[in-house]
Amino acid sequence: MFNMEPEVLERFTWYMREQSALTIMFHTKVAEQMGLSATDEKCLDLAMRADGPLTAGRIAELSGLSTGAVTGVIDRLERAGFVRRVRDPHDRRKVLVEVTAGDLAKFAHLFEKAQQSLVQVLSRFDPDEIEVIERYLQLQIETFRKAVINT
């Protein structure tokens, strides 16, 4: 195992905590403007990034929430017009959660500043550095998901 110097670990821990806090604040602000809670907005985001409709159980797995909590999230998202429940065409006993086009487009502007800041930061790196950053982020996400979310 790599012998991490305590100062390096401390710095990276601080960076990750700061990024996490800023991300939470950002999504809380976005959620408020959408009329949602931060949890509801992140579950909507999970559903939007999926390859297709998800079951409530799958949303629970991806979010780390209980299935009971996810049922409440889906109810609120459905009332707000962001998702709808549909029967699985292959198994009518299953209910899938499908993102609706609804008013999502009117909230796209909320993400523009975040996108612009990402472009601004990435433009300061050459392609080789971006490759290293991307590899780090992929490993961090994979490891964090296994160690924290899937426990």
Briefly describe each language-model feature range.
Residues 73-76, 136:
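Residues within the DNA-recognition helix of helix-turn-helix
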Residues 1-4, 128-151:
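C-terminal regulatory/oligomerization modules of transcriptional regulators
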Residues 68:
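Key DNA-contact positions within bacterial/archaeal DNA-binding proteins
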Residues 27-65:
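N-terminal helix-turn-helix DNA-binding core of bacterial DNA-binding proteins
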Residues 76-131:
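Charged, amphipathic alpha-helical coiled-coil/dimerization segments
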Residues 45, 71-72:
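Base-recognition residues in the alpha-helical recognition helix of bacterial helix-turn-helix
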Residues 1-34:
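N-terminal leader segment of winged-helix/HTH proteins
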Residues 19-26, 63, 106, 110-121, ...:
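Alpha-helical linker/hinge and terminal dimerization helices associated
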